[in-house]
Amino acid sequence: MVNSVIFFDITVDGKPLGRISIKQFADKIPKTAENFRALSTGEKGFRYKGSCFHRIIPGFMCQGGDFTHPNGTGDKSIYGEKFDDENLIRKHTGSGILSMANAGPNTNGSQFFICTAKTEWLDGKHVAFGKVKERVNIVEAMEHFGYRNSKTSKKITIADCGQF
């Protein structure tokens, strides 16, 4: 399986912040990577485009991927509502690691987060399946719009997304 590269064009209250590119670890975590890739391209009829990062905690992560509700309560994968943890071999080694958000074992859907720091306490609990390849500074800039209580001060949106 090819390690595809995904792009997100990020806006803050409708103003462009920049484009990040994310390399997936599809060779090791193919099912999770395919879910993220297909949700980025929209080829299954639903996608990340237009969804927001609803939870940003400085020094921890930026979470998004809820395209059914803007508040983090929605979670839909290309395989149905939820799918199992594929493998937990990748570690949350630092800023830029892409991982699945979940509500416990085997509850992956569409929601994901991008780490902004080393988060080793997530190892073995969340599937890390990619890494920001270019423009991690955009993710770090997104942190400035988050609070410790996970709320955001501005609307951080995936204005466009797809596969290179």
Curated annotation (Swiss-Prot):
Domain of life: Eukaryota
Alphabetized Pfam families for the sequence: Pro_isomerase
Subcellular location: Cytoplasm
Gene Ontology BP annotations: protein folding
UniProt EC number: 5.2.1.8
The keyword Cytoplasm belongs to this UniProt entry's keyword annotation: yes
Keywords per UniProt: Cytoplasm, Isomerase, Rotamase
Any further remark recorded for this protein: It is one of six related genes or pseudogenes found in a cluster, thought to result from gene duplication, on chromosome 1.
Stated role: PPIases accelerate the folding of proteins. It catalyzes the cis-trans isomerization of proline imidic peptide bonds in oligopeptides.
Record protein name field: Peptidyl-prolyl cis-trans isomerase A-like 4G
Top-level taxonomy: Eukaryota, Metazoa, Chordata, Craniata, Vertebrata
Chain's gene name: PPIAL4G
